[in-house]
């Protein structure tokens, strides 16, 4: 049994997220593989929710105990994570500073005024746009923001990009795996594969540890959307090792149990390909399930392609982890102006 119970948790979500069968998407892909989705995009009333809240539930107690008064984080201009940090700060009564780096070469005229960044500002966060490019690692701009809060007499609590390399960043998605096991028992089925987008790494990393408990670590198929696969894999490896130790998995996760596919991140982080756009439209038109051009659109593209290529044996049950992120589609309004 994984020792997730020894960590404090601050509730930010509605609880267990639903799993639904996607019959029309299943049929559109030939019907030989059954597609399901776990709807972490519907997990909370905090500013449209999303996967980062699972992570933040285990980070907030540490922030409160540190006597911080300001959460400080970082992401791109259309960052789901900074939206969720801003929402969390508003909910728990802290101030919030978020650095929003220019991770995406955007062309839409309203990219920096709608969607995630609009909601981040609406919730009172101090949103600071910085011209630095994409990188999933620890950033100087974030460290500068933390120092600026100190210089102003505040007490900052730093949360890195995606909450991923935070010591507790992987715990929430260990909990995801435990939820899935309980839901499988209720539904009378068992999923053969889990599809998840990976960039900063703690969502997949936590899942890998969680599913390692029942021998399914290598069935967690990460679809890279970073375009920096070596860096992403190294970060996932680090998160897996740290999280496995925290929850007392009792063994080291092997390298071959960390499965990340690098075929779908093109042409660049945050830039959808024609195939990404086709996947977004197919999910929307078959299941009214909205995915975004940065993350979920690419993992949806990956899953669709894998089904078509026969990656999953006939009769497989595939669980698509919908992590949220739909607000970002507003930053791509020209691309989707006609649907």
From Swiss-Prot:
Pfam families: PALP. CDD domains: ACCD. It comes from the Bacteria. Its EC number is 3.5.99.7. It is an enzyme of class 3 (hydrolase). The modification N6-(pyridoxal phosphate)lysine is found at residue 52. The keyword Hydrolase applies. Belongs to the ACC deaminase/D-cysteine desulfhydrase family. This is 1-aminocyclopropane-1-carboxylate deaminase. GO terms for molecular function: 1-aminocyclopropane-1-carboxylate deaminase activity; D-cysteine desulfhydrase activity; pyridoxal phosphate binding. Catalyzes a cyclopropane ring-opening reaction, the irreversible conversion of 1-aminocyclopropane-1-carboxylate (ACC) to ammonia and alpha-ketobutyrate. Allows growth on ACC as a nitrogen source. It comes from Bradyrhizobium sp. (strain ORS 278). Keywords: Hydrolase, Pyridoxal phosphate.
């Amino acid at each position: 049994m994984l020792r997730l119970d020894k960590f404090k948790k601050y509730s930010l979500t509605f609880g267990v997220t639903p799993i639904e069968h996607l019959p029309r998407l299943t049929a559109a892909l030939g019907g030989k593989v059954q597609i399901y989705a776990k709807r972490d995009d519907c997990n909370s009333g905090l500013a449209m929710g999303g996967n980062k809240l699972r992570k933040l539930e285990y980070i907030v107690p540490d922030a409160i105990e540190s006597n911080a008064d300001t959460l400080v984080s970082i992401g791109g201009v259309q960052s789901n994570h900074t939206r969720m940090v801003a929402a969390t700060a508003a909910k728990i009564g802290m101030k919030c500073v978020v650095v929003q780096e220019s991770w995406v070469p955007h062309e839409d005229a309203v990219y920096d005024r709608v969607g995630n960044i609009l909601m981040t500002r609406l919730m009172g966060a101090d949103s600071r746009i910085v011209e630095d490019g994409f990188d999933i690692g620890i950033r100087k701009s974030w460290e500068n923001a933390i120092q600026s809060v100190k210089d102003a007499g505040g007490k900052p609590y730093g949360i890195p990009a995606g909450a991923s390399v935070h010591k507790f960043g992987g715990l929430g998605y260990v909990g995801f795996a435990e939820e899935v096991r309980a839901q499988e028992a209720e539904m009378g089925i068992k999923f053969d594969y889990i599809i998840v987008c990976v960039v900063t790494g703690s969502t997949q990393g936590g899942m890998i540890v969680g599913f390692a408990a029942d021998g399914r670590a290598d069935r967690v198929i990460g679809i890279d959307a970073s375009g920096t696969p070596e860096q992403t894999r190294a970060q996932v490896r680090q998160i897996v090792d740290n999280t496995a130790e925290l929850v007392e998995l009792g063994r080291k996760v092997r390298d071959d149990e960390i499965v990340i596919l690098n075929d779908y991140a093109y042409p660049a982080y945050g830039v959808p390909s024609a195939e990404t756009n086709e996947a977004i439209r197919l999910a929307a038109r078959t299941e009214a399930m909205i995915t975004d051009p940065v993350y979920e659109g690419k993992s949806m593209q990956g899953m669709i392609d894998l089904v078509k290529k026969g990656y999953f044996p006939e009769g497989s049950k595939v669980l698509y982890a919908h992590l949220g992120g739909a607000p970002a589609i507003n930053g791509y309004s020209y691309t989707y102006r006609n649907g």
